[in-house]
Structures are given as structure tokens and as C-alpha cells.
């Protein structure tokens, strides 16, 4: 009788559930996974090397394109690393704006993750709900930076500009008549803070809608409970962070453990799972969105009461205002030097990490005193998570591999860098 052999198949990189360009080589015994071998590098763009040929500020837009669903969080880590090298103090208003946009980014990321994770498993409706709210938050991105995704809004020393006092309006067209446009513009009559205030009042109700669709849905639970279990010991050994480690019961969150910006001044809780499976990680992300909503509300209240500068007044780092340049030759020279040569960062090295929606996103920057980085190392959270794919998916059915990829929330921009 012929011997029974395992067979090997390719999962991706063209598979719709591969979340980009993931290629998994799966060794299967029937439908049970014996081995999963992730192949990475299909989206490698050499970001770390490219940064060595650009000035410090010119590399900010590269950061947006790493994890391209959590844009401003990437910029934040990079700007913090530069600020540590420079020893620059960020104005308090800029810190609150950064924290507010970090949390907007967290909600954007989790909405995309929960929507597409459900879509992968077969719950088609969820993604339609989550993209409805993403649209509002993308408008907040667009209001401050002009771009819906790659904002390049943070700068070493603060943010590019203060929050706008009016929101862009929808105009009637052949797809939307005047009545529809009037409803869409109802929340856009005031400033960006008014728009976000309106959103944060509505958002908890939307979260309840998502929970109605998924949390007690028995098919969703059958597909996620007990799937992709990670013990606390394994999570620590594999270097997990974010919802992947919190889902396993370890309350590790850089916003609480190593507070940066004004996270020690805002009130929020860290959701923690019990069983370390896909379902617990989903619940963690759901609760994180509610906590982010709380933080945004606190930031809105503070920003309304406290006007002030949004970028450092050190003109070796940040450009002077137009008014100053018109009357002062010194400021004009600063401006010219900044935008031709760039700032010179003192010799040294610094590591800055933020609590990114996916985990700990770190930037290790080495300066040799020049106007560009000597070396830039990016610590992507998804890299450690994907590395454990083989261990986590072993013994599961091939359909469960899709659920595990969804719960890891992998984005190849940051993994391949």
C-alpha cells in the first residue's frame, strides 16, 4: 500500500484573506495544518536605507507608508526619537493634539481590522458598518493635513499646524441631492473639534451595533473561541505586544507602563483577555475603541480651553512663521537653511516606542551629527506576531489559518519595511 504523505500548498500572495502580500507555505495532513512557513519580503521597499539619504524631516512621509492603516502612530515614534536626540520640548497643546490623533488612528486601525477579520471568516455585513465610521475619521485626517491617509502631519518639535476652525463641506452632485448633503453636513458646521465631539458622542452607539452583530453571534464564536490560543508565557517568549499580548492576560501597554506625551494626564483603562484566543483579542480591540473614544473626549475638552503654540519655537528645528520672516532677516535664513540643508541633529542614539494599534512600534535612530540619520532601525510589532504563525496555527484546520491571520492584524508595509 502506498504511504500517506502530507501535501504542501501555497496560501497567497494573491489570496484575498492574505492581507496584502503574505505567502504561507502550508504543509497539510488532510485539512489539518502540520506546518506553516511564512515567506516575507514581497513588499520590501528599503525604508531604513532610504532614510539614510534624506534629511530628518524628509523621512516623515516614509513613516506613513510603513503600517499604512496606522499612519500618524508611525510618525509619532519617529518624531519622538528625533526629539530625544535634539532634547527639544514639545508644546503641551501639540502633545494633546498628538495623543488625540493617535487615538483616532487606533480607532481607524481597529475598525479596519474587525471589519476585514469578520469578512475573512464570512460575516459580510460588518465591513459595511466599520467603513461608515472610518469615513468620518478620514475626514478629520483630511481637515488637518489635506490627505485622507498619508498625512505627514507630525513634525519634530510638534505638529505641522493648529487644528482648523472649519470643516470641508459636501457639495450636491448627481449622486447626492441637496437633502442628503444637508444631513451629511449637519456635523460640519463648526470646527474640527466640534466635528470630533459630535463623532465621539455617536461612536459608543456604533460600537454597540458591532457587538450586536458579532459578540454573541454563535457562528462568530464557533470560528474564534479556542482558535489561535497563545499562553501568557508564549506571548512573552515570542515578543508579542499590543492586543496580541493583552488578549493573553498580560496588561502591557506603553501608554500606562512608559507614559509618553500626556498619557499620564488622561484617564483610560487597559482591556485584558483571559483565554488568549481570537475571540478574546477581538473583545480587547472592541473595548480599546471605547477607551480611545474616552481619551479623544478628554483631549477635545482640554484643547478647547487651552490655545497655544503647536510647534517648538526653536527655529533650528521648526520653521519660523511667515510674519516673522517678512520682518527679520535672521528668521529668513533659518527658513532657508531648514528647507535646503535640513537640521543637524547632535551625535548620539535614541530609541522611542509608541503603543501602536498593533503593538509596540519602535524607532531606533543613530545620528553622527549630520543632517540625515546615520542608521534607522524600525521595530515593527507585526514582525514578531507573524514569526509565531507556525507555532500558533499547528493542529488547526486550514480555514482557521484565515482567522489567525485576521486576529494578528498583519500589515506588510511594516513587516517588510
From Swiss-Prot:
Annotated disulfide bonds: none
Point out the coiled-coil segments of this chain.
none
Sorted UniProt keywords: Cell inner membrane, Cell membrane, Membrane, NAD, Quinone, Translocase, Transport, Ubiquinone
From what superkingdom does this record's organism come?
Bacteria
The record's GO CC annotations read: plasma membrane
EC annotation?
7.1.1.-
Against InterPro entries, the record matches this protein to: NADH_Q_OxRdtase_suD (IPR001135), NADH_UbQ_OxRdtase_49kDa_CS (IPR014029), NDH1_su_D/H (IPR022885), NiFe-Hase_large (IPR029014)
Q: Where does the record say this protein resides?
A: Cell inner membrane
Topology relative to the lipid bilayer, per the entry, is: Peripheral membrane protein
Recorded GO terms, molecular function? Answer: NAD binding; NADH:ubiquinone reductase (non-electrogenic) activity; quinone binding
Listed under catalytic activity are: a quinone + NADH + 5 H(+)(in) = a quinol + NAD(+) + 4 H(+)(out)
The record's principal subcellular location, in a coarse class, is membrane
Q: Which Pfam families match?
A: Complex1_49kDa (PF00346)
Assembly and interaction partners: NDH-1 is composed of 14 different subunits. Subunits NuoB, C, D, E, F, and G constitute the peripheral sector of the complex.
| Xref: NCBIfam families | NuoD, PRK06075.1
Function of this protein?
NDH-1 shuttles electrons from NADH, via FMN and iron-sulfur (Fe-S) centers, to quinones in the respiratory chain. The immediate electron acceptor for the enzyme in this species is believed to be ubiquinone. Couples the redox reaction to proton translocation (for every two electrons transferred, four hydrogen ions are translocated across the cytoplasmic membrane), and thus conserves the redox energy in a proton gradient.
Homology family: Belongs to the complex I 49 kDa subunit family.
Q: Which PANTHER family match?
A: NADH DEHYDROGENASE [UBIQUINONE] IRON-SULFUR PROTEIN 2, MITOCHONDRIAL, NADH-UBIQUINONE OXIDOREDUCTASE 49 KDA SUBUNIT
UniProt-recorded name of the protein: NADH-quinone oxidoreductase subunit D
This chain is encoded by the gene named: nuoD
Amino acid at each position: 500500500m502506498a504511504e500517506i504523505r502530507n501535501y504542501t500548498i501555497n496560501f497567497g500572495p494573491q489570496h484575498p484573506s492574505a492581507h496584502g502580500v503574505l505567502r504561507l507555505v502550508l504543509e497539510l495532513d488532510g485539512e489539518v495544518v502540520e506546518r506553516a512557513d511564512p515567506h516575507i519580503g514581497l513588499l520590501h521597499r528599503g525604508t531604513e536605507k532610504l532614510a539614510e539619504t534624506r534629511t530628518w524631516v524628509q523621512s516623515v512621509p516614509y513613516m506613513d507608508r510603513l503600517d499604512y492603516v496606522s499612519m500618524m502612530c508611525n510618525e509619532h515614534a519617529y518624531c519622538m526619537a528625533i526629539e530625544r536626540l535634539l532634547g527639544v520640548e514639545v508644546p503641551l497643546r501639540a502633545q494633546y493634539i498628538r495623543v488625540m490623533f493617535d487615538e483616532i488612528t487606533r480607532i481607524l486601525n481597529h475598525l479596519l481590522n474587525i471589519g476585514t477579520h469578520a469578512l475573512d471568516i464570512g460575516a459580510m455585513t460588518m465591513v459595511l458598518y466599520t467603513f461608515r465610521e472610518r469615513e468620518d475619521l478620514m475626514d478629520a485626517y483630511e481637515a488637518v493635513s489635506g490627505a485622507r491617509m498619508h498625512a505627514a502631519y507630525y513634525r519634530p518639535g510638534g505638529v505641522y499646524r493648529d487644528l482648523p476652525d472649519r470643516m470641508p463641506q459636501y457639495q450636491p452632485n448627481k449622486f447626492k441631492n441637496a437633502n442628503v448633503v444637508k444631513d451629511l453636513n449637519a456635523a460640519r458646521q463648526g470646527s474640527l473639534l466640534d466635528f470630533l465631539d459630535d463623532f465621539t458622542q455617536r461612536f459608543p452607539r456604533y460600537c454597540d451595533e458591532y457587538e450586536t452583530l458579532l459578540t454573541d453571534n454563535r457562528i462568530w464564536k464557533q470560528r474564534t473561541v479556542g482558535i489561535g490560543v497563545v499562553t501568557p508565557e508564549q506571548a512573552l517568549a515570542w515578543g508579542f505586544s499590543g492586543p496580541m499580548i493583552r488578549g493573553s492576560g498580560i496588561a502591557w501597554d506603553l501608554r500606562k507602563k512608559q507614559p509618553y506625551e500626556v498619557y499620564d494626564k488622561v484617564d483610560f483603562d487597559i482591556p485584558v483577555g483571559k483565554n488568549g484566543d481570537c475571540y478574546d483579542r477581538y473583545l480587547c480591540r472592541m473595548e480599546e475603541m471605547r477607551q480611545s473614544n474616552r481619551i479623544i473626549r478628554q483631549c477635545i475638552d482640554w484643547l478647547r480651553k487651552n490655545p497655544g503654540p503647536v510647534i517648538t519655537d526653536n527655529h533650528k528645528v521648526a520653521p519660523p512663521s511667515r510674519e516673522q520672516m517678512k520682518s527679520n532677516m535672521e528668521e529668513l535664513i533659518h527658513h532657508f537653511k531648514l528647507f535646503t540643508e535640513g537640521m543637524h541633529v547632535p551625535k548620539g542614539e535614541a530609541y522611542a516606542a509608541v503603543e501602536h494599534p498593533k503593538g509596540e512600534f519602535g524607532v531606533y535612530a543613530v545620528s553622527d551629527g549630520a543632517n540625515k540619520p546615520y542608521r534607522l532601525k524600525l521595530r515593527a510589532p507585526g514582525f514578531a506576531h507573524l514569526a509565531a504563525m507556525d507555532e500558533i496555527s499547528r493542529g488547526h484546520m486550514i480555514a482557521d489559518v484565515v482567522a489567525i491571520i485576521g486576529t494578528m492584524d498583519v500589515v506588510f508595509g511594516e513587516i517588510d519595511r
